[in-house]
Amino acid sequence: MSEFWNNNKDTIGAGLKTVGKYSYKSTKFVAKTGYQAGKSHYQNSKAKREGRSQEGSDDSGQTTPNVHINYKDPSAFPPPPVKPGQLQYHGSSGNSANGSSATIPTLSNTNNTAQLNEQPYMNQINSSNQIYSRPQMAIPEQQVATPEQQMNSTTLPSQPQMAVPSQQEHIHIQPSNPQQLPSNYKPQEQYLQSEQLNISDRHAPQPMERPAMPLPQHGNVPPLTTENVHPNIEADISSPAVGPQFEVKPYDWEEQKTTKIEIPQVDLTSIPPPPTHRDRNTSRQGSNSTPPSRTHTGNNTSTASVTTTGIVDGNLESNQEHTPKPAILGEYDDTLNVAYAPPPKPFRRATNNSSDLKLSGAQNTKTPPPPVVLTNKSAERPNSSNVMPSLPLRQMNTKANSSENLPKAKILGEYETNVDVGIAPPPRPTYRKTDTEANPPNRPLSRSTTEHKMSSISRDNYNSIKSSSVKPPVPKRNTGEREGAQELKADIAERSQEITPTPGISGIYNLDKKIDFAPPPKPFRRAQTSSDIPQKSSLVTDESNISVPNKSQQPMQEKDSIKNATPLYIPPSNNINFPPPPKPHNKSLEESHTPSNKLSEKPKPPKKPEQLKDLNLSTQQADKNMKNKDQLFDNKNELLSTIKNKKRPAPIPKPKPKSLTSEGNHMNLNTEKGKETTIEKPDESKFLPISSFPPPPKPFKREELSKEVVDSVGETADFTKPKRAGQLESTQTEKSNSKGKAPPPVPKKRNAQSKSSPSLEGSEDNPFSKYLKDAVPNEPDRLHK
């Protein structure tokens, strides 16, 4: 590491200097840029705050910027509408309102560019109003109090009526002053006025008269304002306008009740009938109009789609009756009769042996039906091998049947049924064969078309064909080649000469190909046991299941016979015998019986093995099974010998609870055969015979170690050592005869205390009980209980 630093310290130092230099420059640049941006932002915000406060000082401290200077002068707007019977205010021109007559304000057409630009737009509005004139409420036009122009005001009479006169009037504009309109004047005012008046220059059907609904009584309505106002143009006002003066008239409730709304009666006979449905042969009565032709429709589409019927005085215009009306997508001729071919009938195979099902030796061809020709008589399709005769065609009217030999167009065009399709037919469905079927059961029906002949398929490559009627016999199960393969091949070869190759779903299958896979095993099924099966010796498969000898007089001879047993040779037969499965160990049943009963009772004979289903094994398979059984017997004998020679572990003493009585602790020790002590058997005896080992020694309690039994310290020391079975039985019999009851077990860690302190014989289990007696003095009885 030192050499690396000595060699590269100059380079590292130069690099650090360069990095520090550029980092300083970048930091300085970022700091300057941020300072300048913050400073400029502060100055801009300060300037905005100062300008806002100066502008808002006149407006009683408004925080929003004052932009009312960009609005239009209120004097340029028309006055608000008046109520029915209310007098209009007097303008600067001094003209008074006349309540008896309703006049239309006239305007003069000046040379103003704004008005010139407005004329085409107004003409367009008038032409649109000509199409359908909707009745509007009579809102009068008020006078605009400007020095540049003055308008005549109108008032409504006491009874509401339409403000549209019966005659057509042209709009005349009378110039009051030679001056032009101000620059801020917009054509929206005249647009609103023209829309309310609904007066057009052209002669058009006038709308039906409808009385205007009276306006509700409200306060002063705010003036109508135009939406599109240029914000940068200021209104130059030369002289102040005169304020409006209103006269309010109370609303009359009885006037609405006395006014009757007249509904005109429309003559329904003069209305043209609705269009009829295309499938209906007869049209409705009272139709005076004929369906227009395509040429008239193309010429009058634009006019007919725009013009509507105008109703004047309950009469319809006569020119509307003969106006051509276009349909949704064209014209429909109800007299035409469309004759379509009926849908094909679904394929149904005949249940009986009909004459139309004919077998050929190699093929069964299907002839397609001829093309359908619509004639007066129903065209029937010829019967084929699997096609039923179709339904007859529907007979239409005589007009459609006039052209007999001309094929009619279908829904999407004409169809040709005799086109060759290069697709193989689908496989034949499988149905149950009837009793009257003349076909042989082993000869299947082959199905192919004339276009797809199977002559190119060589029989050398496909000698055997898998079909539904030809089923090879199930071969026997073995590990080598299949039995009867030669007979199967010969049988298939004979049948393949009579059967032509039949194409399957994905191709043709060859059963002659050799298959090297073993046959699948048959399912295992338990069969009933028979009495004629010879009883075999049960095999020991678990440590808990060891066969107990039947004869109690010669137990050792039986054990030796089991140890030296050799498996018997079983000839191959259809029935294969396996040993029964081991029984689960039940500890509760073992503890319920005493050892004396276990030795006296005879063991149950081994269960007979269950029979298996016939497996049809060959001699080779039987020999292989016998070899496996020999190996199995050898392994079981070795396992049995190792279990018997295994050394038994030392027993674990367990303390006996004090709740047990002395009767349960009594030990009946007799040297007779078949009787043993009633000690608790440890868990290690599950896998060993009971009679092979003596009972384990049981420790005694210190309380029962009297001077008669324990004479010296050496004898007590020998008590902890494991003794032989004979010595232990002799000592236990002497103590049981002298005391009459068995002492309880002693814990493990009490042996050392029994040597040094024999004075603790009368003490309890707690060794510290003598120290606890006077350790804490008794408290005085304060409560005198």
Curated annotation (Swiss-Prot):
GO cellular component, one term: membrane raft
Stretches for region Disordered: 33-122, 142-406, 418-785
Keywords carried by this UniProt record: Membrane
Extent of Low complexity compositional bias: 91-102
Domain of life of the source: Eukaryota
UniProt biased composition (Basic and acidic residues): 249-260, 478-497, 587-613, 624-637, 672-686, 700-710
Membrane topology, as annotated: Peripheral membrane protein
Subcellular location: Membrane raft
Annotated Polar residues bias: 103-122, 143-199, 283-310, 350-366, 375-388, 395-405, 455-465, 527-556, 659-671
Predominant subcellular localization, coarse grouping: membrane
Keyword Signal among UniProt keywords: no
GO BP, one annotated term: barbed-end actin filament capping
Family as reported in the entry's similarity comment: Belongs to the AIM3 family.
Record's protein name: Altered inheritance of mitochondria protein 3-2
Originating gene: AIM3-2
